[in-house]
Structure formats: C-alpha cells, structure tokens
C-alpha cells in the first residue's frame, strides 16, 4: 500500500464475521433463511470477500443496492441468490435475467414493466415486493390510509406473467433509534401480511 495515497484503511477479520454470522444464525428459527446485506462494498468492508465468506457459511441470500453491485458479485463467482434492494429500470431487465438475480419491486407500474420485459425475453424474473411502512423511499405505500390499495396492487404484481414473486419485505427507517416508530412500521407490515393472507 502506498502510504502517500491511502492514509486510511480497514482490516477486516473474516473470522469475526463468521462468529457474528453463527451467533445470529443461532437466534433464528430453523426454517428462517439468512440474507446477508453486502451493499455499498459491504459497508466498506469488501463486498466480494464478505459475500464469499457468507456464501461458504451457508447464507441463503445476499442483498445489494444496485445492478452494478450484483454484477460485481456474479463476476467474482458468487452463486448465492442476490436481491437488489434498490430500483432497477425495466430497460435493464435483460441484465437482471442474465445475472439471475432477484429484483425488489415497489410499485405496480414497475412490476408491469418488468413483466413485459421478462416475457419478451421468454424468461421469468424473480422479485421481492417491497412494502413502504414508513421509510418513504421505495415501496408500495402501506400506511393506514393506503393499506388496502397496497395489498391489492401487491397481489396483482405477484401474479404477473414473467415474474416469480418469492418474497415480501420492508425497511425499518430507524431500527436502532426510535423504537416506537419501528414498532409502528412492524405493525403496519403485519397488518399488510394479514390483508394479503385473507385474499
């Protein structure tokens, strides 16, 4: 390393990552799958080495922010399923299909566009439906006023031809801060699941 150009660096001990993975895995029910978030270069810790270690440990899924990050992992030989948490334009659907990654979908229009693109390619694209329970970024809006509409649109998105809806998730806006707000988001998510289960 050239000290004149790189004045800071991080040394990541992957055995500590392994310890943390095993500790978290031990807290989960046996039928719960583990998704390791490695977006933003694994938060500065090195996406490829972290993803490779998580893959070797048996993590069932990895998550990244964007298509480029997914491409980096696939290019490094990572075979574990990858979820793209951010939005990807339908024009990039051929690359999603080529990489065999899963795309988060936060609105019906995007789902429909991805459906058309997947059908045109003669393939199926895996998607996870994202519920906006209070992050106010990406997702089907699931506050008390929009819950019914969100459930209806998610149900429609889940059965679009060319798509394989394999999951649903939300993003807690302040999970390590405002516990009351996090619980409100969690309640909204459970309410949404209840509405969807009754459909």
Task: Map each language-model feature to its residues.
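Active-site anion-handling motifs in enzyme catalytic cores
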Residues: 24
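Active-site-proximal beta-alpha core segment in soluble small-molecule metabolic enzymes
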Residues: 4, 8-11, 18, 32-199
């Amino acid at each position: 390393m050239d000290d004149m150009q790189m004045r800071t660096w991080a040394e990541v001990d992957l055995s500590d990552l392994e310890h943390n993975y095993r500790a978290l895995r031990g807290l989960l029910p046996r039928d719960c799958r583990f998704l390791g978030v490695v977006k933003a270069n694994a938060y500065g810790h090195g996406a490829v080495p972290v993803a490779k270690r998580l893959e070797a440990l048996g993590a069932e899924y990895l998550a990244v922010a964007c298509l480029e990050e997914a491409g980096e992992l696939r290019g490094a030989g990572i075979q574990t399923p990858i979820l793209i948490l951010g939005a990807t334009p339908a024009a990039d659907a051929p690359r999603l299909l080529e990489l065999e990654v899963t795309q988060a979908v936060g609105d019906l229009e995007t789902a429909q566009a991805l459906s058309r693109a997947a059908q045109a390619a003669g393939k199926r694209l895996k998607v996870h439906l994202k519920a906006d329970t209070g992050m106010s970024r990406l997702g089907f809006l699931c506050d008390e006023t929009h819950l019914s509409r969100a459930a209806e649109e998610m149900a429609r998105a889940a059965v679009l031809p060319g798509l394989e809806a394999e999951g649903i998730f939300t993003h807690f806006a302040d999970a390590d801060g405002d516990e009351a707000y996090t619980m409100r988001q969690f309640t909204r998510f459970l309410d949404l699941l209840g509405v969807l289960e009754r459909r």
